[in-house]
Amino acid sequence: MVSRTLSLSMSLFRAHLVFYRCALNLNSSYNFGFLVAMTFVLQIITGITLAFRYTSEASCAFASVQHLVREVAAGWEFRMLHATTASFVFLCILIHMTRGLYNWSYSYLTTAWMSGLVLYLLTIATAFLGYVLPWGQMSFWGATVITNLLSPIPYLVPWLLGGYYVSDVTLKRFFVLHFILPFIGCIIIVLHIFYLHLNGSSNPAGIDTALKVAFYPHMLMTDAKCLSYLIGLIFLQAAFGLMELSHPDNSIPVNRFVTPLHIVPEWYFLAYYAVLKVIPSKTGGLLVFMSSLINLGLLSEIRALNTRMLIRQQFMTRNVVSGWVIIWVYSMIFLIIIGSAIPQATYILYGRLATILYLTTGLVLCLY
């Protein structure tokens, strides 16, 4: 039984990581999918290590984090690695998604695109849950503001809070979910790879080509080279950047009676935080936020229709879609800047314009 299981595992390993055929003209942008998987593994390793010392009790959570950083051997390295790798997870996912948009991967890799979108949503949820765990001022008030903005969702937010406000029960639930969700994410990554290899990966030319090589050693070596660069960047940021990616207010214990001057979540939340912030109605902001995510899902579903594929082949050029993707990227960067700004009238106006541009580009990509 053991030998049969081992033989099956090795056959799957050889099929997907040795003999799998991929196009010869793949460039470095195709390595970010592999980097996403590796950053997930690094996050799980550092997260489990940190969980040994963390206390999910409202009265002790902040003190346990400070004890971990100041007194535990190599504690600050693991915390900085965990926080820094979280940023690189989102950076790799966003670059991977942008490459998929730019090269039309969503039009004929529908199941792979949808599984990747589910992974993106799961990563956002996991990061938000982990953002609250240090139990500093910015974590507490950021969780309070964001859960308040998401409160129109029935049942979900009250169940997560465990009451009427962010409390000790909320912290315990966030810790448990933050521990479990990355393992679910690993399952989705495996499904994503399965769906990708089931249909075959795309290539920059956007056409089927007979020039294919085995995954090993060609692609595996390029993946290893990019992974070495990524690990170097992560360790440089973790060792020398330290708390640059965090907010100073998060080093202050929670005070329910003092609100920070400006609520600023992590940079990878800022685009969607800006969408929620610039819409005066909570329900309206939530609908726009959900629409921005649904747009990404509709891309693969609409483009899978034969009629849309025929229209694309007859009346559209590659440069049109590439141009709209570039506008989509710029609108998201602009939303990130607006999300980090103080909510004044000028920034709110620019944020609404950027939100309209972001949604419009998504709809245009769906129609094309």
Swiss-Prot record:
| Cellular component, GO annotation | mitochondrial inner membrane
Coiled-coil residues: none
Give the record's membrane topology. Answer: Multi-pass membrane protein
- Main localization category: mitochondrion
- Read off the InterPro entries from this record: Cyt_b/b6_C, Cyt_b/b6_C_sf, Cyt_b/b6_N, Cytb/b6-like_sf, Cytochrome_b_N_euk/bac, Di-haem_cyt_TM
Q: Which family is this protein grouped under?
A: Belongs to the cytochrome b family.
Checking PANTHER family in the record gives: CYTOCHROME B
Protein name from the UniProt record: Cytochrome b
Please tell me the species this chain comes from.
Answer: Toxoplasma gondii
Q: Which gene encodes it?
A: MT-CYB
